[in-house]
Swiss-Prot record:
Its EC number is 2.7.1.30. It is an enzyme of class 2 (transferase). InterPro entries: ATPase_NBD, Carb_kinase_FGGY, Carb_kinase_FGGY_CS, FGGY_C, FGGY_N, Glycerol_kin. Pathway: Polyol metabolism; glycerol degradation via glycerol kinase pathway; sn-glycerol 3-phosphate from glycerol: step 1/1. Key enzyme in the regulation of glycerol uptake and metabolism. Catalyzes the phosphorylation of glycerol to yield sn-glycerol 3-phosphate. Sn-glycerol 3-phosphate binds at T12, R82, E83, Y133, D239. ATP binds at T12, T13, S14, T261, G303, Q307, G405. One of its GO terms (molecular function) is glycerol kinase activity. ADP binds at T12, R16, T261, G303, G405, N409. GO terms for biological process: glycerol catabolic process; glycerol metabolic process; glycerol-3-phosphate metabolic process. It comes from the Archaea. Glycerol binds at R82, E83, Y133, D239, Q240. The lineage of its organism: Archaea, Thermoproteota, Thermoprotei, Sulfolobales, Sulfolobaceae. This is Glycerol kinase 1. It comes from Sulfolobus acidocaldarius (strain ATCC 33909 / DSM 639 / JCM 8929 / NBRC 15157 / NCIMB 11770).
Amino acid sequence: MSKYILAVDEGTTSARALVFDEDLNVISIAQTELTQYFPRPGYVEQNPEEIFEKQVSMIKKAVEKAKIEISQVSAIGIANQRETTIMWDSRSGRPVYNAVVWQDRRTSDITDWLKSNYLNLFKSKTGLIPDPYFSASKIKWILDNVPGVREKAERGEIKFGTVDTYLIWKLTNGKVHVTDYSNASRTMLFNIKKLEWDRDILEILEIPEAILPEVRSSSEVYGYAEPVGNIPISGDAGDQQAALFGQLGFSKGDVKCTYGTGSFILMNSGEEIYDSKDLLTTIAWKIGKDVKYALEGSIFTTGAAVQWVRDGLGLVSSSDEIESLASSVVDNGGVYFVPAFSGLGSPYWDPYARGLIIGISRGTSRGHIARAVLESIAYQVRDVIEVIKKDVGKEFVNVLKVDGGVSKNNLLMQFQADILGIRIVRPRVIETTSMGASMLAGLAVDYWSSLEELKSKWAVDREFIPSLQEDRRERLYKGWKEAVRRTIGWAREVETME
């Protein structure tokens, strides 16, 4: 009887489960949308119980669609939206508050204070720049603002987890409270040099260490999924680190970009921890005793900008239509779009930037707006690649591997090659986040024997070669940089006018 690996891909907007065979073919996909709540400007929340219930439902549905028995699944690997913060009562198992999503900006005041007083400490210990993006300030906000939670936490009655931790805890019926090194490194509480929770930071933020999960490797058996046949849960990684693994980014210098709700560029930096002023240093994964680090640029709004064109502007009826609309014009017509809906991430790190469309004339059409939106994605990726080249050397970034749903857009991928001036490689299976989770799970239970075996099963779908002349490339990019300059600090400036 054939055996399979199941990936849980718990994203920002959907709960997904995928079944892979030993040749890394996707046998089935089950997916359902998750509800997001926006109770106040800057707030983004989800219901943790909805996340769990829908994820279990998708596991069962993926197995059913694959026309296999649950007993044929050798292991489960989890990849999750990172930083999103869940806290729950350890006795009842009930969340004490909604999940505070990584996009949430309510804690800007806390992180401004941390930046002003402890920037170098946080950067040197965690590799991260204080920002509402990460879990630490979200935890502090819940402890300080939800009645009774701090008192319960002090008594050891509260547990914290990123989404992977919560899912594993629920799947194991409360038996296992763990996370992996990649997810721990995104909390802004984890010392990436000492590989432990940092007590100095916990003291600054007044966070009890007892609420934190045990940190384990990214590929080992953590426990068994009781609601779905007691399958071993043996892979765990943050979604972007999982995607780097799924792109075979095993060697120093390997770079990938995942185009999803946001876009995330990771470069495997091996065992070296780079001190970058504008990028994040994070843990890619730990397998056995081997810890790999990565440089990361985090772009908050890319695929979400395409959704805005569909839902907010009504220019297209489906996200797929944006490519044909953007292709109806030969260029952007001088229009630039900066999608700073919730601030700007790497390399600007400005929570007060706000969105902008500039360069509009009477000749501007729907096509120009659509094209400017797509081009904004590529420009933001170049912003990050420029900093990587500056930090580690130009010789490291000659090829960019791409994945995620938005990478199916051929117009965008060609423009990405053009604006970077390097080759873009899209794999046959763009579900690399799920594939990476499957690989980590499969390696732990000897479903696959080695990284070399995995390399032999990976294939390319298409390569995009740059065709834009360098002077044109640089003129376009200069226009983008000027547009970004005009968005910086906008929300703060407006506040001072009131």
